[in-house]
Structure formats: C-alpha cells, structure tokens
C-alpha cells in the first residue's frame, strides 16, 4: 500500500513538473521574446517557446524606435524549453499565447498554425490569448486610412490570417478564457509617433493572465 501511494505521489509530481505555465507560439519574435523573458523573471513561469525552427531564443531588445538594431545574447534558462511549432506538440501547458505574423507582401501562415495548435490543445489549458491587429474584424471601420491601406494592400494576407484566427478563437469562448488583442502600433521603446512598447504590452498580457487566474 505504501509503495502504491509513493508511486501515485511520484507520478503527480512528474505531471506538475512537465506542465508548462506558458506556451508561446512565435517566441522568437520581438513580442514573443518579451513574453518569454518577463514570464520567467516576473512570474516564475516554466515556458514552452515555439519558433519556426527549433533554435535558441535571444533576449528581448529594449531601445527606442520601431526597429531592432542591436544583437542580443541567447536566452538560456532551466525554465525555458524551445521547440519548433511545426513539430507535434503534445506537452501540457496552462496558457496559450499566439503571437505570429508576417511582413509586407509575405504569405502569412498564422491561421494554419493556430488551427494546428487548437486541434491538439491539452486539457490543462486554461486560456487562449491571440495577438491580432488593429483593423481586423469590426475595428476596420473605425481605423484610419493607413490601416485600411495595409489591410487591402501590402499586409493583405496578414489581415486575412488574423481575421481567420479570431474566428477560430471565438469558437472556444464557452470552453475557456479567450482574449483577443488588437494593438495599433508596437515599438521597442520611445517613439515620436503614438505606439505601445513591446515591454509594456507583454506586461499587460501577462498581468491579465495571472491576475485573473488568482481571482
């Protein structure tokens, strides 16, 4: 009987250790790296960071402007596991964050990737958090002409993918917590134009996840 109890306790311990707090799809991007860094340092999270190919993740760049212009060191931490999001992901995690995208005139596969992740969503998942874009859904009508040009021209496929992602996430609203963010402009720090720094935006996302979890 004691041996059986020990085995059960051991298996429960393994399950707790192997369940990530965060699964970040797009962990190698500017916002993704902020989420990884702040998740580990500020929230003591274990993080599954998923990138286009299995490689290391750099520390986030924190400077002024919209462009990253300083090479950053690789992030190595015992609470971070990096994998390719095209691999079969069967890990347990509590919160899924989707923050992939494409550049001007590029093909955006974010909707395909979102479908892949949702089809293998673990029972342990408590929330889905999508980083969409201003100009998707009902926000297009109230957006300025610049956003409307991006939507219809050089970021056309990105907006198509974001709209599809939002539709997918909305189907899970009755099953778990879902959040869709539509930032207008993301920067790395201070800018002359109106923008939100990736540092502040990542902090907002993580606060929403873990503040509500504790209620």
Show where each model-derived region lies.
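Conserved beta-loop-beta element that borders a ligand/cofactor-binding pocket
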Residues: 166-189
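N-terminal Rossmann NAD(P)H-binding glycine-rich loop of SDR-like oxidoreductase domains
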Residues: 20-44
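Short-chain dehydrogenase/reductase
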Residues: 107-111, 144, 151-164, 195-199
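Conserved Rossmann-fold cofactor-binding substructure of NAD(P)-dependent oxidoreductases
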Residues: 71-93
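Alpha-helical substrate-binding/gating segment
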Residues: 197-215
């Amino acid at each position: 009987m004691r041996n059986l109890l020990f085995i059960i306790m051991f298996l429960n311990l393994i399950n707790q250790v192997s369940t990530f707090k965060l699964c970040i799809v797009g962990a190698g991007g500017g916002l993704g790296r902020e989420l990884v860094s702040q998740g580990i340092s500020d929230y003591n999270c274990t993080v599954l960071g998923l990138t286009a190919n299995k490689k290391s993740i750099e520390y986030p760049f924190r400077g002024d402007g919209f462009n990253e212009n300083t090479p950053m060191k690789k992030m190595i931490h015992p609470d971070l596991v990096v994998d390719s999001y095209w691999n079969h992901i069967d890990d347990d995690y509590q919160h899924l964050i989707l923050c992939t995208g494409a550049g001007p005139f590029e093909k955006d596969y974010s909707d395909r990737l979102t479908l892949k992740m949702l089809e293998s969503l673990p029972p342990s998942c408590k929330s889905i958090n999508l980083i969409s874009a201003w100009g998707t859904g009902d926000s297009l009508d109230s957006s300025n002409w610049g956003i409307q040009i991006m939507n219809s021209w050089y970021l056309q496929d990105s907006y198509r993918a974001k709209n599809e992602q939002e539709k997918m996430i909305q189907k899970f609203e009755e099953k778990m917590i879902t959040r869709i963010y539509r930032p207008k402009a993301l920067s790395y720090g201070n800018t002359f134009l109106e923008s939100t720094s990736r540092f502040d935006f990542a902090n907002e996302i993580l606060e929403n996840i873990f503040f509500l979890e504790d209620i």
